Regions:
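A short glycine-rich, Lys/Arg-flanked "PGG" loop and its adjoining helix->strand segment in the class I
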Residues: 146-161
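Conserved class I S-adenosyl-L-methionine
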Residues: 1-63, 159-186
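Short alpha-helix
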Residues: 187-202
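Conserved Class I S-adenosyl-L-methionine
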Residues: 204-277
Length: 277
């Protein structure tokens, strides 16, 4: 199949590249960390023995105690660590050293010794196949999504399991982008576009929708300002920073737990999975 015969994949690529181009146009290269995710990494680390995570409980239904799991883009081990407690072995592939530092620390604290971490992108990673390949909230920013998915398939002996939001996870920050940078944010593709790509590839997955998840808030104005500066590529003390601080006052509301974005709707996500055998 030629590129011209893949309109869904072409649309996906255009959206991702346009989003990245828009981001690069406002970035101050001198202010960027080589590891974008390092400042956020600790927020993605959770107790691997937690029992109050309905998403985790749904995911582990796809994994047996004697199976091996490959977690692609698994970050700080949010799912890799608890899954490792319930299966034979987990391999975690992740390009962010900041995220992997958190995963290693979490594994050490929990006494998990059946986790292998591989530093690098999925495109460049060389790993052995596993029974189940998990890919949680990774595909949004992948321009060449078809070969990425084909590689997931090639490494899954039994099943591919993808976790995806209906809307891109950062879409709730779009009003701040417009207030700061003066233009509408180009959104990355999400679950609807993924399904179109999969169907175009001849993959017809099962889709299981999960319960809505409450929108993430911030414990304080300082935390909100720090995280939004990083997410929106805003340098402190610039005119854009002034616009951001004004927009926080206008677009957020105080709650007993801190700050929340006005009108932010609960996130809807689903498990997209298919057999490969």
């Amino acid at each position: 199949m030629t590129t011209r015969e893949q309109p869904a994949a072409d649309h996906w690529r255009d959206r991702v590249e346009s989003h990245h181009d828009q981001s690069e146009a406002v970035q101050d290269a001198s202010a960027l960390d080589d590891d974008f995710w390092r400042p956020f990494a600790s927020h993605f680390r959770l107790d691997p023995r937690r029992t109050d995570d309905p998403v985790l409980e749904r995911l582990v239904r796809y994994i047996g105690p004697d199976q091996t799991v490959l977690d692609v883009g698994g970050g700080a081990g949010r799912f890799a660590l608890p899954v490792a407690l319930r299966c034979r072995r987990v391999t975690l592939v992740e390009p962010s050293e900041g995220m992997l530092d958190e995963a290693r620390a979490g594994a050490g604290e929990a006494g998990i010794d059946n986790l292998t971490v591989v530093t690098g992108t999925w495109e460049e990673a060389r790993v052995e196949p596993a029974d189940v390949v998990l890919c949680s909230h990774v595909l949004y920013g992948v321009a060449e999504v078809v070969p990425f998915i084909r590689k997931l398939e090639a490494h899954a002996r039994e099943r591919v399991v993808v976790l995806k939001f209906i809307n891109p996870p950062q879409s709730r920050l779009s009003p701040f982008w417009k207030a700061v940078h003066g233009e509408e944010r180009i959104e990355m593709p999400a679950m609807p576009e993924l399904l179109s790509v999969l169907w175009e590839m001849g993959i017809y997955p099962d889709v299981e929708m999960l319960e809505p998840r409450e929108a993430h808030g911030y414990s304080s104005r300082e935390e909100a300002l720090d995280q939004l500066r990083r997410r929106l590529y805003v340098v402190p003390g610039t005119p854009e920073d002034g616009s951001l601080q004004t927009s926080i006052a206008e677009l957020m509301v105080e709650t007993p737990d801190g700050l929340e974005i006005k009108g932010a709707l609960p996130g809807r996500q689903g498990v997209v999975s298919w057999w490969t055998r």
